[in-house]
């Protein structure tokens, strides 16, 4: 019994609701990222079909024009939907995890704007990384889930809420990079000035679930 207690204390298993939240969040976030990836792939394939005509010069102009249209659409979401959708996401999350709140950074409009903006820019073929946006989107999903009635105690506790946001950062980076251990370590490096070691197990657990769902949908694709 003493050994079981020590293991439970070391792994911080004394709050089952936190682990239930991590499992549910990891599944929802991973499914959303898979959906977004599939949507980007479909959009890119549609662009290839549109530019596949008998005339090479038309193909070139159609490809360039559609690329410009998607880029303009992706960069306009900050103006038309939410200014909080602009930027990477990692510097802002580092600020939030340091204890400085950013007004409306986790709003629903920011989620819609970030999703549409990332989709449009990736479909355009622009050389834009997914790590920062996935961190922001992951934290947006985490925040929305914490607002539910069942997990309202997590949302009301500043320390637990910060822990869950750090877990969300690790999940977003893991899905973008495809590496659970590396994603967790990189999330510590990029988003935290002071890191609670007790959060390491939770972040790694969420990242493993993320990779498992990735494997389910992408099969033998290397991750």
Please identify what each model-predicted range represents.
Residues 1-223:
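Alpha-helical transmembrane segments and immediately membrane-proximal extracytoplasmic
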